């Protein structure tokens, strides 16, 4: 994957971050219409700020994104903006969620962030394949499906 340097009026930059954040209480609510709405909302909010979503994937209980954030913004301010504004927009579109979450806070506090250097292709591949990895992991670790009366 070619390394793309971005430009501002007096700056050349390449600031990419792998970010993971979750709904409040890590509830598995990101599916169907809510999933497509969250994707659309995050794309729109990033476009407003000039942030590029290089890769992104919405899991039922968390969101993975690879973002190119201009150096004029801190990661903390971008995440506050994305999580705050998207919460309001999600509750506007899905008013029934207020009973599950209350206080118009859809996202949990905090997030995971790591910088992406020259291993951008590896991180993008990880984000793309995260869902299939989680499904395989769940199949291996689901104890409820085992017969409790079977001798070992």
Short names for language-model regions:
Residues 1-152:
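Basic nucleic-acid-binding interfaces
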């Amino acid at each position: 994957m070619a390394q793309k340097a971005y430009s501002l009026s007096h700056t050349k930059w390449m600031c990419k971050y792998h970010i993971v954040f979750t709904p409040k209480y890590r509830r598995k609510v990101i599916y169907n219409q809510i999933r497509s709405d969250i994707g659309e909302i995050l794309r729109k909010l990033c476009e407003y700020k000039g942030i590029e979503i290089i890769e992104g994937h919405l899991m039922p209980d968390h969101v993975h994104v690879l973002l190119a954030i201009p150096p004029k913004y801190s990661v903390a301010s971008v995440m506050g903006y994305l999580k705050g504004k998207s919460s309001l927009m999600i509750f506007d579109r899905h008013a029934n969620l207020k009973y599950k979450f209350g206080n118009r806070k859809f996202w949990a506090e905090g997030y995971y962030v790591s910088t992406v250097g020259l291993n951008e292709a590896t991180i993008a591949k990880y984000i793309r394949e995260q869902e299939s990895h989680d499904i395989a992991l769940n199949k291996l670790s689901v104890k409820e499906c085992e017969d409790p009366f079977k001798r070992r």
